Amino acid sequence: MKNNHLILASAILCAGLVPVYSQPGRAPAMPKMSGHMAKLFGGISAYSATMETQSKDSSGDTTTMPSKIFCLDGKTRMETDMAKMKSGNLSPDAAEQMKAMGMNSMVMISRPDKKISYMIYPGMQAYAENPLQDRETTASAADFKVETTELGKDTVDGHPCVKTKFIVTDDQGAKHESVVWNATDLKKFPVKIETVQQGQTMTILFKDVNLAKPDAGLFEPPSSYTKYDSMQTMMREQMMKRMGGGMGMPPH
């Protein structure tokens, strides 16, 4: 088992990405809920929900990722258990290996107000802090213009909805097109979104929607966790701890 962990850790460090799949360097696209996506929520700035993201890449491979999401005034928190992900790109034993190393549970926090993000691994009691470099993520609401076209009425998960085509244009002239199902019994919350992000076609479904404000503490990393200045540093040190138990770095 220790050899398997070493192989997986090496792949992580070489790719610089987590999690690891049968094709190294590929990771599921997680939706960005800021920038043009935030315009799809209208005036709703605080909510929590369970979320299922279905993404299809250019080769036709489909990934389904369940998660929990919390949003408050532009801040976003996503909690994901990789063991629950369904994907043809995930090797059969990768999920179990990630769980054994404390890597299966991930929390991603985006703080546009601070221009930073956190990647947190509760199983490791560690997190990496990274600068938010995506211009769209830190753009203001005034940087986007919205055009809408109503497409009809529909029902999603028991909620009566208005189906609407959104075209959001940013201040650089780039257009982002989405189809949105706004639930009329949830203050027009978008319980279903179809869009394209990072070159992948996405369908995002929201359930158990709660429009109460989440606790502000959810958008901070735990003070007791070890902080790292990059994902690579965190992965390297955590893998050495879990594999070595005092072995130290492998010889060059």
Label every model-predicted segment.
Residues M1-L8:
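Bacterial N-terminal signal peptides that target proteins for export
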Residues P24-H252:
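Extended soluble regions of mature proteins
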Residues A9-G16:
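Bacterial N-terminal signal peptides
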Residues L17-S22:
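Sec/Tat signal peptide C-region and signal peptidase I cleavage site
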